A protein has these predicted regions:
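N-terminal leader segment of winged-helix/HTH proteins
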Residues: 1-26
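Pre-recognition alpha-helix immediately N-terminal to the DNA-recognition helix
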Residues: 32-37
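Short capping segments at the starts of secondary-structure elements
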Residues: 41-46
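A short acidic, leucine-rich amphipathic alpha-helix
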Residues: 49-55, 66
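Basic amphipathic alpha-helical segments that dock to polyanions
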Residues: 66-76
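Non-DNA-binding regulatory cores of transcription-related proteins
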Residues: 76-163
Length: 163
């Protein structure tokens, strides 16, 4: 697992350096550290979670700086923002097309790689006034942990109502 994380970090760092050169952006220590923290995670962290990961190594960094850097990553295409109107935005270093499963109870976001979902673009004839550039699908439901907790709670409620 550590080697895999290291490989992801190296790939993202090289991609970042290339994109920064093309866009004329400085490769600051803040950007590198935040990118490393994001690439090391596979749980789609919030700004607060990335901030907690880096605050010791980047003394004096603010949540606002972390937010701005993550938004910069999204705008230059080296990260994706996963928005959910019911919870905080989350960020993903994996920019290849994939979809998500979002738990409505705890907010956990899980990657869903299903090639059958990658060909759902509507027929071009129906899109006369719109060009689709990209898309992702989010399925909302309960993760296994919350589903189990919910089932246990329901059993307890049933057993309480039966006595």
């Amino acid at each position: 697992m550590k080697n895999n994380v290291r490989n992801i970090r190296e790939i993202k760092r090289k991609e970042f350096e290339t994109v920064c050169r093309h866009k004329g952006l400085a490769m600051t220590i803040q950007r590198r550290t935040i990118l490393d923290a994001l690439a090391a995670r596979n749980d789609h962290p919030t700004v607060d979670q990335v901030y907690e990961d880096i605050k010791e190594s980047l003394k004096g960094v603010s949540r606002t700086t972390v937010y701005r850097v993550l938004e910069t990553f999204v705008s230059i295409g080296i990260a994706r923002k996963i928005s959910n109107p019911e919870s905080k935005a989350r960020f993903d270093a994996d920019t290849k097309r994939h979809h998500h499963l979002t738990c409505i109870s705890c907010g956990k976001v899980i990657d869903l790689h299903d090639p059958t979902l990658d060909n759902l673009v509507p027929d071009a004839d129906t899109l006369t006034e719109f060009d689709i550039l990209d898309y992702s699908i989010t399925f909302n439901g309960l993760c296994s942990c919350c589903r189990q907790a919910s089932a246990q709670s329901a059993e307890k409620d049933r057993s309480c109502s039966e006595s």
